[in-house]
Regions:
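Short edge beta-strands and adjacent turn/loop segments
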Residues: 41-68
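Hydrophobic membrane-insertion alpha-helices, especially the h-region
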Residues: 9-19
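Hydrophobic face of amphipathic alpha-helices
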Residues: 32-33, 37, 85-89
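Short amphipathic alpha-helical segments
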Residues: 37-40, 80
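Mature extracytoplasmic domains of secretory-pathway proteins
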Residues: 62-120
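N-terminal Sec-pathway targeting helices
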Residues: 1-11
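Polar/charged, Gly/Pro-rich intrinsically disordered segments
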Residues: 94-162
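Bacterial Sec signal peptide processing site at the extreme N-terminus
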Residues: 21-35
Length: 162
């Protein structure tokens, strides 16, 4: 009888470990992120939700925004995120969530007037460490999260690039 309980416990523990480790998203819970999220939500009543996730090999944020988003507001949101996401910040993310490896990119998915469902986002704001998809430390290939792109969903293409 004891062997059956022990075996059931081992199997249950293994299943739990598989479920926990197979989740590709790890919720980011750092002081800087918490303060940034609180500031963003307080400064704009239309921001209903903002969460950050580490999703190897990058950092992902998801925002639920109530109401229409004009290009100027999208650029303003981008500027706010530019102030947070830099090489130093992304290295902290890597140190805390990926054994010291710096995330290769940042993506902000914005969902307007609805809860997020799958990848049915309305806007995507992103930035990368490297200029190309080749991940290396060649100085000619390093952008350091300085270039930001705003894209629309449904093949709308690039709306803004800074």
């Amino acid at each position: 009888m004891k062997k059956k309980f022990f075996l059931a416990g081992v199997i249950l523990s293994a299943l739990l470990l598989i479920l926990v480790e197979s989740n590709p998203n790890k919720r980011v819970r750092m002081k800087e992120v918490r303060q940034f999220t609180e500031t963003m939500c307080r400064s704009d009543e239309h921001i209903k939700d903002l969460k950050f996730y580490f999703q190897r090999p990058g950092l992902r944020a998801e925002m639920v925004y109530e109401g229409p988003l004009e290009k100027e507001k999208l650029i303003s949101i981008t500027e706010d995120f530019k102030a947070l996401v830099d090489v130093e910040f992304m290295q902290k993310i890597g140190d805390n969530y990926w054994g010291g490896a710096r995330p290769s990119g940042f993506e902000l998915y914005i969902y307007c007037d609805r809860d997020k469902e799958g990848n049915n986002y309305d806007y995507l704001i992103d930035s990368r460490y490297n200029k190309t998809y080749i991940v290396d430390e060649n100085p000619d290939n390093i952008d350091g999260y300085k270039t930001w792109t705003i894209s629309g969903a449904e093949n709308e293409g690039v709306l803004y690039k800074d």
